[in-house]
Amino acid sequence: MLLHLPLAELEVGHHLYWQIGNLNIHGQVFLSSWIVIGALLAVVVLGTRKMERDPRGVQNLLEFLWDYLRDLARDQIGEKVYRDWLPFIGTLFLFIFVSNWGGALIPWRIVHLPSGELGAPTADINTTVAMALLVSLAFFYAGLSNKGLKFFEYYVEPTPIMLPFKIIEEFTKPLSLSFRLFGNILADELAVAVLASLVPLLVPLPVMLLGLFTSAIQALIFATLAAFYIGEAVHEEAH
Amino acid sequence: MHSWLLLAEAATPKGGLFDLDATLPLMAVQVVVLTFVLNALFFRPVGKAVEDREGYISTSRAQAKEKLAQAERLEAELKAQLLDARKQSVAVIQQAEEEVDRLFREALAVAQSEANSVREKARGEVDAEKAKAFSGIDAQAEKLSSLIVDRLLAA
């Protein structure tokens, strides 16, 4: 699928295929994800190397992030079990955030791949669906491990009429989660690429800034919704 | 140049925007692994540091409050003691003044009475001497007069 523009070519839907056994995987997604994960881990390792009671340098940033994520998880999941889910919610947020910003800020075009091009890992549908399905799994795991079979009462509350809607919701949740993130990031990358191909200087900058903003917002939305779903699963009804 | 990236170009699938394949489960595994790695490297140590600090702050706050209360109690106690001491000192000064006054009056009274008695005695003595002198003069005058009379008569 090639988008033909007067000045430059824009590639969409081209992938760098790696084959493992009979399976095809998108190499460019993994390459860029390893780079952003590497950057994330580098910051984390740098900041936690020498923890002090009076935080210094990167430790400040990490503590701010931790505090922010704790508040997010605690608000959505509740005081009782948020500790179990903080790493998962926090990882989703951090991974999506560094992926989105990495996709926007790292000059991927320097590297030429034989096929496809590097970009935000979250601009690939596989990544977002994978994370959305993990959220669904976490939803069921959290509900079942906290309430046992009583968890399924969730589907008939407050009234059994809700049953079909709640079942449909289980399918729409991962669908909306994955497509929201995928669509936003891909659209942002395309908008920037199209503008940059038309007017290479200055004009794409506002769109890039807007892209950074939406990227951050999307990470927050994904993490908040994931926490909200898990919070729904572990929520205790006040009977 | 980048042929090492192309592990198998032979049977390349068609591709596309919604091309779901083995990337999905592998990415899921990667995210789960990343969750555990970040839990060990980030969430646990940073959480421990932050919560340790929160604990440290709350205990030092409580300690400081306790110390402040203690200081206030001590201050009140010392103020009460000071007030007491002031009152006592005023009382002592008053007492001492009264004592001095009393002693002075006593001494004055004693001295006055003594002076009086000495004066009385002196006056008595003077009177007696006077009386004695007068009586001596009288006797001598009588003797002299009788002597004069005798002489006149004898002449």
From Swiss-Prot, chain A:
List the transmembrane segments. 27-47, 86-106, 125-145, 190-210, 211-231
Q: What keywords tag this UniProt record?
A: ATP synthesis, CF(0), Hydrogen ion transport, Ion transport, Membrane, Thylakoid, Transmembrane, Transmembrane helix, Transport
Q: Is the keyword Glycoprotein assigned to this protein? A: no
Its domain of life reads Bacteria
Report the locations given in the UniProt record. Answer: Cellular thylakoid membrane
The main location is membrane
Specify the protein's topology with respect to the membrane: Multi-pass membrane protein
Q: What does this protein do?
A: Key component of the proton channel; it plays a direct role in the translocation of protons across the membrane.
What is its quaternary makeup?
F-type ATPases have 2 components, CF(1) - the catalytic core - and CF(0) - the membrane proton channel. CF(1) has five subunits: alpha(3), beta(3), gamma(1), delta(1), epsilon(1). CF(0) has four main subunits: a, b, b' and c.
Query: What is the designated name of this protein?
Result: ATP synthase subunit a
- Specify the species: Synechococcus sp. (strain RCC307)
Q: What is the lineage of its organism?
A: Bacteria, Bacillati, Cyanobacteriota, Cyanophyceae, Synechococcales
Q: Quick one: which gene encodes this?
A: atpB
